[in-house]
């Protein structure tokens, strides 16, 4: 049989537990509900990092995320910088004051909080947004 109930990524992050492997999420049927999103993101990131890339010049990127994903995103961006020193990524962890400060998922961070906490700090002029379009996941530079 197939499971119908999965704990969201928040449960693992709040408990300080590792996110389960991809097999745990079966077909990622609850992805839009935040179930398995961190696992999928990390696995896609690591697969992309394993591929060779040509990078010309220095790249500066700002990444904005919520408090829950902040530590993992920071770790991943540090790994990116170690492998590609010409890429300088600054991670901005934004507290969600709009919803009372106790909601840490990045998808619920509001523009109001991003502006209030990042104004004058986003210096690169480049950011990336994860896009789920036509069933395909890709990273869209902005």
Per-region residue spans from a language model:
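Auxiliary Fe-S-binding modules of radical SAM enzymes
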Residues: 1-142
